Amino acid sequence: MTNLEYLNLVMSTDFPLDHYDSEYLTKQFNNLKYKEQKSLSNTGIALIKHYHPSIWRCNIKNHLAPINAWNDPEIMLKVINNRLKYLKTDVLSAYNIRSGLSISKIAPKVSIFRPAMAKYLINKYLNEFEVIFDPCCGFSGRMLGACALNKKYIGQDINSITIKESKQMRNDLKLSADLCCKDSLYDSGEYDCLFTCPPYSDKETWHQDIEILSADEWIDVCLKNYKCKKYLFVVDKTDKYKDFIVEEIKNSSHFGTSNEKVILIKRDS
């Protein structure tokens, strides 16, 4: 097919979403739960893409959301040209082209917290606790990691759509999780431990009105609003809490490399 033929195909095709049968989804979770995983493994990502189609409606700052870019012929022709050039093939699937939106950086997908990374961090820093509280639960990566370790997960998020999607995942996979839609900025509570990856300022948009805070400001909020024995945060940068960094996560992708900071804070008894 020619570039223009691919473009015509895209323009006549709905945005490709991920759909898997229950057997495959269960196998994905069992792999996360029972098999040893590297922290940067993509195991469990398919679960997130299946249950959270709303990720494709969200966008990186100054970029279109992938699902909106799909309907723009000028953008999609650039993506198709990019895919044909770098894949060195003249046979593309709709999913190849969708991936090209992120790889070409034209309309990249928002970030997903790897379930394998969540499992690794909980096991390393919070394993003495049976219940994990997450005030910014997002697209369920930390829920999957916690439940893969047979922990109970309590998660909340300001976005009602992602909570609805997470509840469907919980119900289908029979996960031990309590989920609710709540604004953590105006909440309080007491838990054994807290584990979250708060929004990175205004780098990503989820089509809702939220207050824009820095990572340090989010940590301040969590320490003020929630009384816990331990707090575990993954953030892109910190000035105020540098002394509490216990490790860095090095990510490599088509966008280059980045280092996320893992911050562990223990509350004095």
Label every PLM stretch briefly.
Residues 1-46, 51, 55-69, 74-269:
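Class I S-adenosyl-L-methionine-dependent methyltransferase catalytic core
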